[in-house]
Amino acid sequence: MGSDLLSHLSANDRALFWEYGQGAKAFVPFQCAHHAFEFHAKANPDLTAVEEFETKITYKELDRQANCLATRLRGSGVNVGSRVCLLVERSPWLVIGVLGVLKAGAAYIPFDGNVVSDSTLKHAIQDSAPTVILTLRKFQHRVADAASTEIVYLDETLCTSYNPNHCTKPRDFTSSTNSVYIIYTSGTTGTPKGVNVTHGNVTNLLCIAPGNLGMKPGIKVSQMLNISFDFAAWEILGSMVNGATLCLRGKTSKEWKAVMRNVDILFSTPSMLAPHNPADYPNLSTVVVAGEACPKATADLWGARVKFYNACGPTEVTIANTMQLHTPGDIVTIGGPTPNNSVYVLDENMRPVPIGEPGVMWGGGAGITKGYLNLPDKTAERYVPDPFADDGSMMFNTGDLGRWHSNGTLVHLGRIDNQVKIKGFRVELDGVATAMETCPGVQAATALLIDGELWGFATPASLKPEDIKEAALKVQPYYAVPTRYLTLDEFPETANGKTDKRILRQMALDAKNQEEKPANKAPAQNAAWVNLPTTVIAQAAGAQPPTIPHRSSERSLVSTVGSTVVGSQVKQVDSSASSALEKEEYIWSGYLEDEVPEKTQGRIVRNLRHQIFNLYRRLFSVVFIINMALFIWILVTKDYDAHRLGGIVVANVFIGVLMRQEMVINTLFIIFTAVPPSWPLCIRRVCARIYTIGGIHSGAGVSAFVWLVAFTAQATKEMINKGKTSVRTVAITYVILAELLGILIFAYPALRKKMHDTFENTHRYLGWTALALVWIQFMFLTIDYLPEGQTLGQTLVKSPHFWLVIIFTISIIWPWFRLRKVDCRPEVLSNHAVRLWFDYGVTPDAGTFVRLSDAPLKEWHGFASISIPGRTGYSVVVSRAGDWTSKHINDPPTKMWVKGVPTYGVLKLVPMFRRMVLVATGSGIGPCAPAILRRQIPMRVLWTAPNVRETFGDNLCNSILEACPDAVIYDTRKHGKPDMVKLVLRLVKEFDAEAVAIISNQPLTEKVVYGCMSRGIPAFGAIWDS
């Protein structure tokens, strides 16, 4: 039958019809979206699945929460074929909700409770008849009329059990033909229609190239779009089915940009992307746009720096059924059909048009959805059997006009309903916009027919409309060139990020009304234009405001402009938001415009000094170079044997172990931080870096391995040549060498970060085994070289190496002599943090940390101790940052194992300085709290975190504010992620601080320390070497 429909085409066009119109055949590895997610949750359980600034959820935790939610939904009657209305907002709850619904076998219907109109939400609930409405408590008022439907509050169903059997997945009967989600179209031309999309539709795009866009474990993906927009499913489900990390954007432009600077793959509409410069986002590797026509200027600008995909497809063909990797300078097309899909360009009689001729684009293949919910007539009108496939499958009338380009890609020519009649001629408005975009400097353009006149809209506002008109006349006939123009800073956008043509139309009418006043009349035959700034867009939008529900204000703590001496009367800071608080001027107001001090040295010198050869690496180098000098000297003089080389190995192991021994660390910290504030700053800033002694540990460890390799070679040589070294000594040596090699491999920084648990286990278990083997090897070697006339005991007593082995053995074992199981009192601060209180006769000094465990032979975790002046005991703050912490937040312990003694860390240095800025992000306030509470020196505290009081509780927040009333507490949820370097530099200047100390994650710590040190300001932060 398909061949009969092609009989009117030439032989060449018939061949190209099949070549161009059929996507590649590809195997789809997963039939259901949640099956693909579960595969990655099992393969990479500890990888971050969802990231919302400082809040992170691993695949294992997300899978557990989704399983619990699915079980809860099954209990409410949700099963295969059910539908669940998901009324949430952009947050981790969104992703938990999506996966929980899918695991229960149902389809989700997504709406953003902050955006969706009352009429759309009401219609969708009545039309879809969901079994359950899954929402957040804050949106309770939005579903008050849905009394007959069970409402489950997602934020109140968090699973608090750590019992894995409690969170098992319910039986799964889902197949590829079952619905995955239902998207309600915008309804700009009538009542919103629910499009029924299946699992097979979705996995066909998201689980294979090019639709997977290179998403994989370790790749960060943006979530920028309105969750009701089917394009957002590409972000959300795309990242989950490919094992990537989904990064949720906030509400402010700063938060948007912060996420854009943090991800690898960005999804956007062209309108959303237009204001941004790709040079500001060097991290981005892939950008995909869809939803509206992409201006060539945007495609060329971004395509020069990233893999830039222009995609197209209505909701009915599942997100996008065509994609094109754009090459700057080429024509902007929407590409060809994605794998297992097809595209046909047909005339009004549903016959293929000749290649290159315009026609209506129809889609076929695996992406064609089930149809419209409860609208059989509308479905039958737009979905028809595919005569070209002749296999019973359906094809869909997209309503888009297009033509095949000679390179086999599709040129999008706009909508059928976007054609207008001007002076008797049929004009395609998207073609008019494309002609306007040929004018140099035009970033985006669109055209509308308003009251019989053709209007052109372009950005930016600085454009000269006469230039736009001149460029358009070179491409379009006179009747298809706008006679009136509006140039704007940027186009207004709909909730889905598309250009809001309703507002543009109103702006044009307002401008026309102004023109028609007597004083402003212009000759009708001339082109007229108005330049409008961005602020006018908001005014125009306000003329007919969309229905948007009230957004509750978020709580935050702020510090107002002004200075208060530490220790003065405490400011009363209310824990709830107030109107007065909203009007206060923030201490950081305008900080981004501050002029920062110049860096003190040339780029190469300062990078060498502060990044490549920081003090930690310099200490490492000193130890290693000394060893290598000795190594070369011994090789040159040939004054060595296995016994002497073994002694050097022991000496290095001795140094390495002692640099990790708690009592040694504390002694060194006490000595170096005893330098009084009256001493010159140049001395204090060096002594304060005592926390970098880990460089000595690492240098000695690597040197010991090098010497052990030399010892092994020499011992093997002596054994072969019938020398003193015995076979048993050499055999033990090779075992030790293999174990130390394993320890060194997993201690490599990049591998240590990626496989931290493995690093800990190899360091612990191989270290213990190696210690026992070292003793055996040492005894064997001593016997091999036993002098005549001496007993083994006499030789050992006289051997300095024997005493070194004894000392480092005691050093390793000593903390275990102080192992005990103690009581603790949990104080649950939130679902993100718990505070554990201990009182077993130990009151740590400020700046120390303790080691805690619930399985002492398996793992230990270090936490900063918070001691309250005048009280015995201490507390620690445990915040959600992995499985171990999550377990103890969900099920707080009453007993814990402790060992060793509290050990000093970086903040022991605080008393060395006269005035200091102390910086903490999130739970980093824990290590900072003791220094703050003791009020040892005047200090300015900067604490950035989302929802501070809700996360860390009033007690901790109030105690910080009492000790430091001028503390700057920056709510990242409300204000977005700050430029920490600029903000810290402002506080240093205002407070006249001598130094800065920061407790944060590794990237931010290194960034702030470098930002200060390179400008001559002493700055200190933790070293991640263990």
From Swiss-Prot:
Catalytic EC class: oxidoreductase
Location of region: Reductase (R) domain: 682-901
Pfam families: AMP-binding
Positions of disulphide bridges: none
EC number: 1.2.1.-
Residues binding AMP: 332-333, 412-415
Residues at which NADP(+) binds: 685-688, 769-771, 840
Region (Adenylation (A) domain): 37-422
Assigned keywords, A-Z: ATP-binding, NADP, Nucleotide-binding, Oxidoreductase
Alphabetized GO MF terms: ATP binding; oxidoreductase activity
Region (Thiolation and peptide carrier (T) domain), start-end ranges: 556-638
Record's comment describing the protein's domains: Contains three distinct domains: an adenylation (A) domain that activates the substrate amino acid which is subsequently covalently linked as a thioester (aminoacyl-S-PCP) to the 4'-phosphopantetheine prosthetic group of the second domain, the peptidyl carrier protein (PCP) domain, as well as a reductase (R) domain of the ferredoxin-NADP reductase (FNR) type.
Role this protein plays: Adenylate-forming reductase, a natural product biosynthesis enzyme that resembles non-ribosomal peptide synthetases, yet serves to modify one substrate, rather than to condense two or more building blocks. The A-domain preferentially accepts L-serine, L-alanine and L-valine as substrates. The natural product of the enzyme is not yet known.
Family: Belongs to the adenylate-forming reductase family.
Protein name per the record: Adenylate-forming reductase 06235
Native organism: Coprinopsis cinerea (strain Okayama-7 / 130 / ATCC MYA-4618 / FGSC 9003)
